[in-house]
Amino acid sequence: MGAPSPDQDIAAIRRNYQRASLRRVDLDADPVEQFRRWLQQAIAADLQESTAMVLSTFDGKRPSSRTVLLKAFDKRGFVFFTNYGSRKAQDISAHPNVSLLFPWYDLERQVAIMGPAERISRAESQAYFSSRPFGSRLGVWVSQQSQVISSRQILKMKWQEMNRRFANGEVPLPEFWGGFRVVPTEFEFWQGRENRLNDRFRYRPQQDSHHAQTWRIERLAP
């Protein structure tokens, strides 16, 4: 079959989801462990950018979204890194509640995570920064993220300047760069099904009889 016509009616483009199902009995009681299971399956399936997630923030007037990479997660939350002067970081400073979305299209799955984002410790940021390749560490110093620049030549000149400055290979962690941790208050796991009768399960925190936090799991209508 040839490539679709650029004039094709996009309303007619559809795919019938039938790869898998999701039942309540299949779910781990801990949403972080359920996420780990699905992420491992996404990695095993060799999906392109399986750790990519859409981060949505709010500046008080309008939302904005962008793709960032998950770099760590545990029961405390989900970590990504950015320039603290970026639009996303400024949004978070004023309105910390955000959402994350992992769209694993080839598995007909997605996971949405909601909760407040908070800065991680400098020690945690340093540990990750030190693990990055030289060029990636240098790039942090080159770009004033989200600022208007007149041309790409500005970046090339700044790169040359930073390359000379850190020619010995020792690139320090700048004060303006580091990580955020999204502390989850809600999860939704979505599995595509035939006829758009998709499986959706939501996790929300609750306390058990011993006042320990557990998670309530609810099936949602598609």
From Swiss-Prot:
Pfam families: PNP_phzG_C, PNPOx_N. Binds 1 FMN per subunit. It is an enzyme of class 1 (oxidoreductase). One of its GO terms (biological process) is pyridoxine biosynthetic process. Its cofactor is FMN. GO terms for molecular function: FMN binding; pyridoxamine phosphate oxidase activity. Its EC number is 1.4.3.5. FMN binds at residues 66-71, 81-82, 87-88, 110, 145-146, 190, 200. SUPFAM superfamilies: FMN-binding split barrel. Pathway: Cofactor metabolism; pyridoxal 5'-phosphate salvage; pyridoxal 5'-phosphate from pyridoxamine 5'-phosphate: step 1/1; Cofactor metabolism; pyridoxal 5'-phosphate salvage; pyridoxal 5'-phosphate from pyridoxine 5'-phosphate: step 1/1. It catalyses: pyridoxamine 5'-phosphate + O2 + H2O = pyridoxal 5'-phosphate + H2O2 + NH4(+); pyridoxine 5'-phosphate + O2 = pyridoxal 5'-phosphate + H2O2. It comes from the Bacteria. Coiled coil: none annotated. Keywords: Flavoprotein, FMN, Oxidoreductase, Pyridoxine biosynthesis. Substrate binds at residues 14-17, 71, 128, 132, 136, 196-198. Homodimer. Catalyzes the oxidation of either pyridoxine 5'-phosphate (PNP) or pyridoxamine 5'-phosphate (PMP) into pyridoxal 5'-phosphate (PLP). Belongs to the pyridoxamine 5'-phosphate oxidase family. This is Pyridoxine/pyridoxamine 5'-phosphate oxidase. It comes from Prochlorococcus marinus (strain MIT 9303). The gene is pdxH.
